[in-house]
Amino acid sequence: EKHWRTYAFEYLLREEEFKIQARELLTAYHQYIQDHPPQVVARERKFSFTIDELQVMISGKIDRIDQEGDRLAVVDYKTSKNKEKAKGSLQLALYTEALKRDAVEGVSGKPGSTILHFLRHPDDPLESHVFDTADLDKQMEKVTAVSAGIRKYEFPTKPGDFICRNCDYREFLCPAWEEN
């Protein structure tokens, strides 16, 4: 209760709905942790590393790092309703790369599994993957492509109902929306 931010909500009814959902998610998560206690090494840990050949700095924050045998597991919490695969996650690949490079503040060890913990799926909350060298190389190709696009000021639109539905420019300025 003391950390709840009432001012973040425009409408009282919406705040009450979110508060109920938050309580349900936290209750289910607490039960899951009681049933499956992790060996937590760190929480909310910053990392930063440079990909020299691209002159690109990657930085971020890892939600949780656990000890799993002689390896470190990265856990990223998700509140989305839809589950996604850990295998194709660029985010998790970059977390693995940060551990490989010893770039996580106050944490060192060999990377192991990466885990997406879906809080809205208490019966089956985890989606995990261990990134091997080939997986990491594939994900780093994405970083290379994105950084090249940024340097060329190329930001291609990706129109779609989910992305575009709240866009103020959709109806009168967006040629990509018109084509779609």
Residue locations for each model-derived region?
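Short, well-ordered loop/turn elements at secondary-structure boundaries
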Residues: H36-P37, G60-K61, Q67-G69, K110, ...
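A non-catalytic, helix-rich entry segment at domain boundaries
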Residues: E1-K46, T50
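Non-catalytic protein-protein interaction segments used by genome-maintenance enzymes to assemble
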Residues: A42-A103, K142
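Residue-level signal for well-ordered alpha-helical scaffold segments within enzymatic catalytic domains
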Residues: E24, A28, A93-E97, A145
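Glycine- and acidic
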Residues: H3-L13, A73-N82, E127-S128, Y153
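Active-site-proximal structural scaffolding
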Residues: E15-K19, M57-I58, K85-L92, V107, ...
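Metal-dependent nuclease catalytic regions and adjoining charged, substrate-binding loops involved
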Residues: K100-N180
